[in-house]
Amino acid sequence: RNYLGDRDYFKELAADKADRLVVSPPVLGRLTKKWSIQVARAIQRDGRFDGVVSIAVSPEEWAKQLASFEAGPRDTLTLVDARGHVLLRTLDGASHFGKQAPQKREYILHPEQREGHYVAHASVDGVLRVYGWTRLRNPELVMLSGIALEDALAPVREMSHRMRLRAVVSAVLFT
């Protein structure tokens, strides 16, 4: 047997009478010694809490699936809960478990907003990215897509450099 009564998702469901799905931040399994995200719902019997039913999802495997959508080597997809806890991240995933997004982010401050965007240096790796975010059907979850600006602008910078070089060569040849 595995005791779950001290897990946050279990406590949250035990204390709440509403019938809802809870997605936990990554937890380290006591038996498996592997990270998992628990997707859980309370079992109610005669209107009283009687336990939980849950499924463990591997954040590493989930992140691998999401990584197939990335365009650049430093672009990232990140799933956070409503409080900004990182559930999974496609870059360096396991090193971000338990970390939290800055509390000034719109998706934390304004739970009524469904989507948005911003430009920021990532708090976890310092890379400047433009982020788009959307609240999923479960309003407790937010998916962020971050595109590394330096990488995204590299082709434009290269073209600009070539155009300046052509202008200099043209000026030298035709003057």
What is each model feature region?
Residues 150-175:
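Cytoplasm-proximal transmembrane signaling helix
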Residues 39, 110, 169-170:
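Alpha-helix boundary/capping detector
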Residues 38, 86, 161-163:
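Short alpha-helical segments used as structural interaction elements across diverse proteins
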Residues 45-46, 60-143, 147-155:
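Intrinsic low-complexity, intrinsically disordered coil/linker regions enriched in small/polar
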Residues 1-69, 73-76, 121-123:
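Extracytoplasmic/periplasmic ligand-binding sensor regions of membrane-associated signaling proteins
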Residues 4-9, 51-53, 97-101, 130, ...:
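Charged, low-complexity, helix/coiled-coil-prone segments
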